[in-house]
UniProtKB/Swiss-Prot annotation:
UniProt key word Translocase: no
InterPro entries attached to this UniProt entry: Tospo_nucleocap (IPR002517)
The organism of origin for this protein: Tomato spotted wilt virus (strain Brazilian Br-01) (TSWV)
Taxonomic lineage: Viruses, Riboviria, Orthornavirae, Negarnaviricota, Polyploviricotina
Gene expressing this chain: N
Any single GO CC term annotated in Swiss-Prot or TrEMBL for this entry: ribonucleoprotein complex
Compartments, record wording: Virion
Matching Pfam families: Tospo_nucleocap
The protein's name: Nucleoprotein
Length: 258
């Protein structure tokens, strides 16, 4: 019996040949821990300003499409377009995205940066879609986390409760949030977050539960359905004129929707 690396060719051999094959254990993949990866790579993005980090999040989808077109190199880091296996030290777009979110959350400890993030992130489409109120540092941290890889970020110390509470909220409110379960399984994501927490022996003690309840209270006050109502209110004067052409006065109705 021979042990081989897991590649396209070895999979073909596994399916078509009579000899016994086993794949080599990928120690890097098995032992991967984003907390360690974060500590080792966070300096790679230290030169990014807070505004630049926010620009990355706001344009995440467009940036991802460009980066994934070919091998993408910045500084000493290369994100490969294709790879047979992702090692524990390899940079990927998801890991880069998570690094930037961790960096931004850390920046909320500075009052000046907190105010900058608060004012800029309010215009991000995802924050508006969630109807998330940005009243304090905790709500801003939640805003930074929206759209991020919660299972990855949950491994970083002090990010456990914000990750698990947000995962629960997304699972509970996926319909209101417009999440397509075929594209993003919220239950699976929550399970992955809990698996990460269990693997690091995280204890949900009284202090952690208290912290989680604070995040849950903020999310409970958000209104995922508010975006359309706010937009309607913005055009209410003109919309009402068209309603009147149909013999209906809708000012009161628009106010109710808002």
């Amino acid at each position: 019996m021979s042990k081989v690396k897991l590649t396209k060719e070895s999979i073909v051999a596994l399916l078509t040949q009579g000899k016994d094959l086993e794949f080599e254990e990928d120690q890097n993949l098995v032992a991967f821990n984003f907390k360690t990866f974060c500590l080792e790579n966070i300096d790679q993005i230290k030169k990014m300003s807070v505004i630049s980090c926010l620009t990355f999040l706001k344009n995440r989808q467009s940036i991802m499409k460009v980066i994934k077109q070919s091998d993408f190199t910045f500084g000493k880091i290369t994100i490969k377009k294709t790879s047979d296996r992702i090692g524990g030290t390899d940079m990927t777009f998801r890991r880069l995205d998570s690094l930037i979110r961790v960096r931004l959350v850390e920046e909320t400890g500075n009052s000046e940066n907190l105010n900058t993030i608060k004012s800029k992130i309010a215009s991000h489409p995802l924050i508006q879609a969630y109807g998330l109120p940005l009243d304090d540092a905790k709500s801003v941290r939640l805003a930074i986390m929206l759209g991020g890889s919660l299972p990855l970020i949950a491994s970083v110390d002090s990010f456990e409760m914000i990750s698990v509470v947000l995962a629960i909220y997304q699972d509970a409110k996926y319909k209101d949030l417009g999440i397509d379960p075929k594209k993003y399984d919220t239950k699976e994501a929550l399970g992955k977050v809990c698996t990460v927490l269990k693997s690091k022996a995280f204890e949900m003690n009284e202090d952690q539960v208290k912290k989680g309840k604070e995040y849950a209270a903020i999310l409970s006050s958000s209104n995922p359905n508010a975006k359309g109502s706010v937009a309607m209110e913005h055009y209410s004067e003109t919309l009402n004129k068209f309603y009147e052409m149909f013999g209906v006065k809708k000012q009161a109705k628009l106010a109710e929707l808002a």
